[in-house]
Amino acid sequence: MIKQGMNILKENEKKRLDFNPELKQINFLDRRVYKRSEGVYYPSVTTILQYMPKNKFFEGWLKDVGHNADYIMKKAGKEGTQVHEAAERLVLGEEVSWMDDYGNAKYSQIVWEMILKFAEFWKTYKPELISSEDFVWSDEHKYAGTADIVCKMNGETWLLDIKTSNSIHKSYDLQLAAYAKGLEESKDIKIDRTGIIWLKAHSRGPSKQKNVIQGKGWKLLQIDEIEKNFELFKMIYNLYSLENPNTEPIYNSYPTTIKV
């Protein structure tokens, strides 16, 4: 049963744990690093980008929300996780329901609205899925991460990142560039275009311009300059490396069975 359970884990989840059936112990890796291979760990792209200098808007936001900052960020993180999980199920052809098997709501109104917006994008533009939530890495530059969606649109290979934030940040461009380079190195997938599916956009509906992809409350922001953004990412990585010369994981160990 345990082996069956391990088999249904996503590939990127497997990169964050070690399972020892003989000791009946499972070790979860912290969220800052990925396991590339036995004894080899790379920092995550999102962790590296936390070392990107924050602008005045961020400093002002921290002053405004004060002690509520942690709560707000955790709540936003939970919403983003729910939207990403639902989006992955949708692109794989599964049905997503607002209610669980017991008739209880699984999602808040805000989360469900964002899921519906993503579904509208996918149903309207019908991208050809190549992969979703794919573990990517770069042995040359020593980082790893999870790419949201790789697909074909209009004959081009796109890397798409789903964002549920209230605003769009420059770090997102660098994140996409790092994933694009990681896909090329680890999966031999050449990315032609990158884009952000922003599910809290202020758009009022479809655009009359043919090259603009958007709907009510959502928009595909097309991000160019992969090479330039990757150079910026490497600069941020240098800042990260100064503060973290050794990427050593922190494990949380738990038994696989318990009895009281």
How would you describe each model-predicted region?
Residues 137, 150-152, 199:
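A generic structural motif
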Residues 183-260:
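Metal-dependent nuclease catalytic regions and adjoining charged, substrate-binding loops involved
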Residues 1-144:
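Metal-dependent nuclease catalytic cores that hydrolyze phosphodiester bonds in DNA/RNA
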Residues 89, 93, 181-186:
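Active-site catalytic microenvironments for nucleophilic, acid-base chemistry
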Residues 2-7, 15-17, 153, 158, ...:
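DEDD superfamily 3′-5′ metal-dependent exonuclease/proofreading module
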Residues 83-84, 145-166, 179:
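Conserved catalytic cores of phosphodiester-cleaving nucleases, focusing on short active-site segments
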